[in-house]
Amino acid sequence: MGRKASGAARAVGELVAGAGSERATSPNFDLAGRVAIVTGGSRGLGRAIAFGLARAGADVVITSRRIDSCRETAAAITEETGRNALPVACHVGDWDQIDDLLAETESAFGRIDILVNNAGLSPIYRSAASVSEDLFDKVIAVNLKGPFRLMALVADRMSRSGGGAIVNVSSVAAQWPRGDAMPYGAAKAGLNNLTTAFAHAYGPVVRVNAVQPGAFFTDVAKHWDMEAFARHCRGIAQRRGGEPDEIVGAVLYLVSDAASYTTGVTIPVDGGYWQPFELAARPDA
């Protein structure tokens, strides 16, 4: 009996190993025929992600508050990749504008297969006591309230049309609270919570995941205290910050069929970050 069981286990193991080997050597990252919305898609990480999705075959909707930046990015994507790219102005903290964004997307493409919640806001402030109610509300609106509404509306549509994938762009500030990013870190921690909650609420047909970037050299890096950053790079395994293109692989994996059994997770893309540090230049007290 033990010998038979052992033989059966070995046969199953070989079958699983063979299937795993096939998947490992030929993962399906092809996004041809799919439509992706990328919020905050006109610059920084969002722009890199939008280009990456288009290069993989997706048509993309580029949205941010500035339509001129959206148009420039959309034109550049179409010129390079030949994919359709729709620029749409949208402040994700305004739920009425979210409704308009989805209406324009569906009018142009008839479907939504991928949502990347990338838009973010992390303003510099002098101290916790100096944070106004208006500033706090703006940070929560862009980083948490807006993504919640977008996920709710898009996941509902996806669940009725065969499925889809959502990726939230979080931050190491969600895991490593910092004195210079309190509202932002709290909002991103909430976004991590929503990632898991939405994965369970809309699974199995809709997959919801997050990437958790560390320090990337986007336009916000101009506000960093670079001497402090250089010192604290000693707490990063890669000993450096990231380039925007280095976020693309993780996002592409999560939205593609290669991640068909991955949902409800947050993947760090942070160079091996383990020690919190404050990047913003501190104003004089």
Label every PLM stretch briefly.
Residues 151, 187, 195:
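Active-site helix of classical SDR
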Residues 35, 42-44, 66:
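Conserved glycine-rich cofactor-binding loop
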Residues 156, 199-204, 260:
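Alpha-helical segment proximal to the catalytic Tyr-Lys
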Residues 126-128, 132-140, 166, 221, ...:
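Substrate-binding pocket helix/loop in short-chain dehydrogenase/reductase
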Residues 3-27, 122-125, 176, 252, ...:
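Short C-terminal tail/terminal secondary-structure segment
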Residues 171:
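Residue(s) in the substrate-gating loop at a strand-loop-helix junction
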Residues 67, 89-101, 133, 245:
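The beta1-alpha1 cofactor-binding region of Rossmann-like NAD(H)/NADP(H)-dependent oxidoreductases
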